[in-house]
Amino acid sequence: MSLSRTFIMGALFLLAALLILGCAFYLVVCVHRFSCFQILSERRNLLSWALAAGIVLLLGLFAFINVPTLLVILLHLVAGFLLLDGVGLLFRFFHLPLGADLKGILALVLTATYLGIGCFLAFHVFETRYALTTDKPLERDLRLVAIADAHLGVTLDGQRFARQMERVQAAEPDLVVIVGDFVDDDTKKEDMLLACRALGTLNTTYGVYFVYGNHDNGYYAYRDFSSEELRSALEENGVAVLTDETRLIDDSFYLIGRRDRSMTGRLSAAALTEGVDRSKFTILLDHQPNDYATEAAAEVDLVLSGHTHGGHIFPAGPIGLWMHANDRIYGKETRGGTTFIVTSGISGWAIPIKTGTFSEYAVIDIYGK
């Protein structure tokens, strides 16, 4: 890992730690407002605060399982209590009663309900459909399934991923594409192998193709398989790995797989499309939706991406778009003659909750001339 990346990661961990401490302190105060603690504080003030802190510390046990998830839970609890504090001020303005106990219970119920829905949206995989038309000739109408951001080990282990591939097979795709972040640093080798075997069971007209995302090669050394073992497992199961490669499929359409922008030596969209027959439909796979201008200039017909997780935790998506972190967060748009589709992903990184989006795979029907 480079020195600059080490510094950035260290700074992020420090910021997360400070945020967790601040949230924890506020939550201790909120817990202490409950009448049972107020009654105890009249006799044993120190004990009442210690018990309130103990309850919040129990929540901190999640840190041993998943620090990002703990941070999400803490932030939403804080938001819930702050919202009810605001409602309490409004009630007080109109001289209406809203006791501390009721406010606290409502905050807990609201937060639990919101995060519960987020869990459902993360674990339940939806099928999203798109229909495109082109003036270019195709040997046959084309149905492709785009899968991104499995991050095996978060909401999908190898067996659950295999069950999703049964659903994909039921859609009768002509082509299946894996648009990066198939695995992560915490993915177990067993799950990786099971998922690769599941991809190998897919019966399609034109095969299964894979491009790397920023997590597939791994950021750390503790993963129990290498990027070479991942590639071997994919290829042994009939999955074609494209790394800055252009292929003409059935003399009908081009499939272009880009090296991820996190990797060195990445070719430009112009270089990858140089020499292609412009009368044929072109599909470009690029994990991160960050190069729309040059991809549109290269006159690609369809660009498929993932990476953003559709925003994952609200309001990360709108903030990322406002900061120009990506050209698009989710869905379809057209620039010139190029259609861009970003899928929210079949899972997501680290946090088994989605409040800004939902898990999906995309079924895309392309109707030719």
Show which residues each predicted segment covers:
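Non-catalytic terminal accessory segments
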Residues: 1-123
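Generic preference for hydrophobic/aromatic residues in regular secondary structure cores
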Residues: 27-31, 127, 293, 303
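Generic structural signal for short, solvent-exposed loop/turn connectors between secondary structure elements
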Residues: 56-72, 92-103, 127-129, 133-142, ...
